[in-house]
């Protein structure tokens, strides 16, 4: 595995790989790698000959008061994990290399980015869209793999590449969970041992919703209210949002329809830690118990 920090050097490598007729896939991360990230690499390998992982804690996607300074950065550990996973190139630029002096241009997202996460994290998705656009131009992949845990981000990136005519296939990867259902996340390390136990209430809420749909309940507002009650009954939990949304538009929906794909989104604060999760609810298969 080669480690590259210079964007122009990475561009040259990617161009050379393409000239050899090989397929390229990219997995974008902020480091603090876990099994969820490794699953993205595994999926990337299925669609490509060469896999690039990007490792960059992007400052422009952190809102004021968020955890930019304390975000975990175990670089040597991440290098070992990436190499063990079979990554060919690890692109790990500095902030100065990605946003040099005089940098002025950014990507502004539309209505899709104004709801849910966008409403609670000012400027977040504009920062995501800007860095993803830059990384796609640097790595020149045929496919890019993103986790479904950040479902709204995935939808925005799909919109981004469609709107800007970026020639790349965006592939969504299933959420990887702990044995007790908690979605894998680099921020889980912030949880105390007691908070970690209580954090399973998010998965419990998702499973409750699936069970209610399986019973035949069609009123999604009612189910969302039940999930909210379940979560707020857990010590230390406050809710940013619980919402059923159309998977493509992220507009709220109120009535179940097994012919469509929709998701239940959760954003919950547990102590000082903010957790997000989601689950597909809009297919007959998704009604199966957790």
Swiss-Prot record:
Organism: Chlorobium chlorochromatii (strain CaD3)
Reactions catalysed, as given in the entry: (R)-pantoate + beta-alanine + ATP = (R)-pantothenate + AMP + diphosphate + H(+)
GO biological process, one term: pantothenate biosynthetic process
Pfam families tied to this protein: Pantoate_ligase
GO CC annotations on file: cytosol
Pathway: Cofactor biosynthesis; (R)-pantothenate biosynthesis; (R)-pantothenate from (R)-pantoate and beta-alanine: step 1/1
Subcellular location as annotated: Cytoplasm
Catalytic activity, EC: 6.3.2.1
Gene3D superfamilies in alphabetical order: HUPs, Pantoate-beta-alanine ligase, C-terminal domain
Top-level lineage group: Bacteria
Protein name as catalogued: Pantothenate synthetase
Gene this chain is encoded by: panC
Organism ancestry: Bacteria, Pseudomonadati, Chlorobiota, Chlorobiia, Chlorobiales
Note: The reaction proceeds by a bi uni uni bi ping pong mechanism.
GO molecular function, one term: pantoate-beta-alanine ligase activity
């Amino acid at each position: 595995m080669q480690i590259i920090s210079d964007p122009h050097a990475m561009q040259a490598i990617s161009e050379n790989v393409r000239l050899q007729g090989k397929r390229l896939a990219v997995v974008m991360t902020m480091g603090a790698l876990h099994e969820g990230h490794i699953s993205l690499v595994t999926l990337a390998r299925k669609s490509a000959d060469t896999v690039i992982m990007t490792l960059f804690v992007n400052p422009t996607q952190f809102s004021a008061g968020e955890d930019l300074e304390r975000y975990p950065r175990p670089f040597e550990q991440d290098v070992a994990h990436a190499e063990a996973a079979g990554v060919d190139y690890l692109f790990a630029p500095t902030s100065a290399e990605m946003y040099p002096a005089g940098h002025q241009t950014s990507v502004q997202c539309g209505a899709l980015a104004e709801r849910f996460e966008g409403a609670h994290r000012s400027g977040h998705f504009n920062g995501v869209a800007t860095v993803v656009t830059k990384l796609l131009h640097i790595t020149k992949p045929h496919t890019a793999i993103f986790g479904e845990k950040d479902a709204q981000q995935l939808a925005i990136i799909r919109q981004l590449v469609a709107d800007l005519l970026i020639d790349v296939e965006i592939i969504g990867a299933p959420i990887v969970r702990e044995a007790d259902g908690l979605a894998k996340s680099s921020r889980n390390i912030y949880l105390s041992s007691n908070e970690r136990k209580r954090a399973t209430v998010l998965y419990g809420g998702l499973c409750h919703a699936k069970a209610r749909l399986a019973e035949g309940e069609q009123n999604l507002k009612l189910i969302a209210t039940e999930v909210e009650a379940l979560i707020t009954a857990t010590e230390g939990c406050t809710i940013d949002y619980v919402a059923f949304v159309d998977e493509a538009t992220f507009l709220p929906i109120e009535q179940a329809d097994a012919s469509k794909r929709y998701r239940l989104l959760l954003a919950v604060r547990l102590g000082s830690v903010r957790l997000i999760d989601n689950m597909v609810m809009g297919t007959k298969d998704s009604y199966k118990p957790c």
